């Protein structure tokens, strides 16, 4: 595709108009949000709010703050009795999806902070998690 476009300014095969339109819209949305820096700041805020609220209900972030990426956050299981499968189902039934941990030395789960996710979404998720944790006790 690139060579064809570079050579004569045309698509090599049928133009992928839906892909180009989607990419154009994504660039418009990125610009509206303040560019890469604005998007990064939203992700970073999502991460800060998520870690703060979960810590308040007894779920600790696995990675220390200075090494934490704003993209996905890993949390340690709050207790030995914690069941990820039950937790996952509880959250999914309420419209959110999380991920199992990928570590071998400690039980963890992960929550993505990026995409079309805003602080109000993080707050709602944290309310659901708090409801689950209170029901465990």
Indicate residue ranges for each PLM-predicted region:
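Conserved PLP cofactor-binding pocket of PLP-dependent enzymes
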Residues: 94-110
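PLP-dependent enzyme catalytic core of the Aspartate aminotransferase-like
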Residues: 108-137
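Short amphipathic beta-strand starts and helix->beta connectors
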Residues: 54-60, 92-98
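Flexible, glycine/charged-enriched surface loops at secondary-structure junctions
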Residues: 33-42, 58-65, 100-103, 137
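Active-site C-terminal subdomain of aminotransferase-like
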Residues: 1-52
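Short amphipathic alpha-helices in soluble, non-transmembrane regions
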Residues: 85-93, 124-130
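Conserved PLP-binding catalytic core of the aspartate aminotransferase-like
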Residues: 60-90
């Amino acid at each position: 595709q690139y060579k064809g476009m570079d050579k004569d300014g045309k698509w090599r095969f049928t133009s992928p108009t839906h892909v180009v339109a989607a990419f154009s819209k994504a660039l418009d949305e990125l610009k509206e949000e303040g560019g890469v820096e604005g998007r990064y700041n939203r992700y970073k805020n999502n991460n800060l709010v998520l870690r703060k609220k979960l810590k308040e209900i007894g779920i600790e972030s696995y990675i220390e703050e200075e090494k934490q990426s704003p993209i996905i956050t890993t949390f340690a299981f709050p207790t030995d009795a914690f069941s990820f499968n039950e937790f996952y189902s509880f959250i999914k039934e309420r419209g959110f999806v999380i991920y199992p941990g990928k570590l071998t030395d400690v039980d963890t789960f992960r929550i993505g902070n990026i995409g079309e996710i805003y602080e109000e979404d993080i707050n709602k998720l944290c309310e659901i998690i708090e409801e689950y944790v209170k029901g465990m006790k």
